[in-house]
């Protein structure tokens, strides 16, 4: 699942905002983070996993959404992003909160930072066709925006340290970092575009 998403070009919405269902992602061959999460949810439902997504709220309003699942070994995720550190995690986290916290360091850039998270079962949408609709599925986005999120509190001093490190790295490189992040052994494989640098 993660390999398939990694192979898709990221949907930068060059021709206007989209929120495509799995059918739309397959038809267009591209996906942004929420489209990838919805696609993963549809596919993994066929393997008897509930369609759960984890929504991050960021201090700069650039939120992120990933598909999450629980295996015998713990909680893991499947994700697509423009940032190398915000892709999938292996199923080794004891709780959804621990999984969410694993994204803390790699979420920090010039302005970003996690402030809250929520796990949402998309079956609450009832008969709304978020899986295979041929049109945009904006109701999913509205659901996530309105859903109560649990706060994640981190040391402001630590946040500023990480932000300074990120800014210093980007001043020297035209690409985004990932090799200096802790816990990379718990990440799933990155898309090829990131592997040779960072």
What function would you assign to each model-found segment?
Residues 1-198:
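A structural boundary/capping signal
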């Amino acid at each position: 699942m993660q390999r398939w998403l990694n192979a898709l070009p990221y949907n930068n919405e060059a021709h206007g905002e989209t929120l495509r269902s799995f059918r739309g992602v397959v038809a267009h061959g591209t996906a942004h983070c929420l489209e990838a999460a919805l696609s993963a949810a549809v596919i993994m439902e066929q393997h008897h996993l509930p369609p759960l997504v984890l929504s991050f709220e960021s201090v700069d309003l650039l939120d992120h959404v990933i598909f999450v699942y629980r295996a015998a070994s713990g909680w893991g995720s499947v994700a697509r992003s423009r940032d190398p550190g915000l892709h999938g995690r292996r199923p080794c986290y004891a709780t959804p909160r621990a999984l969410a916290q694993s994204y803390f360091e790699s979420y920090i850039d010039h302005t970003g930072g996690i402030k809250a998270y929520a796990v949402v079962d998309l079956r609450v949408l009832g008969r709304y066709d978020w899986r295979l609709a041929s049109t945009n599925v904006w109701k999913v986005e509205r659901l996530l925006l309105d859903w109560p999120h649990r706060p994640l509190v981190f040391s402001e001093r630590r946040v500023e340290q990480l932000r300074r490190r990120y800014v210093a790295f980007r001043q020297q490189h035209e690409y985004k970092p990932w090799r200096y992040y802790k816990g990379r052994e718990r990440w799933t494989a990155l898309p090829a575009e990131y592997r040779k640098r960072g």
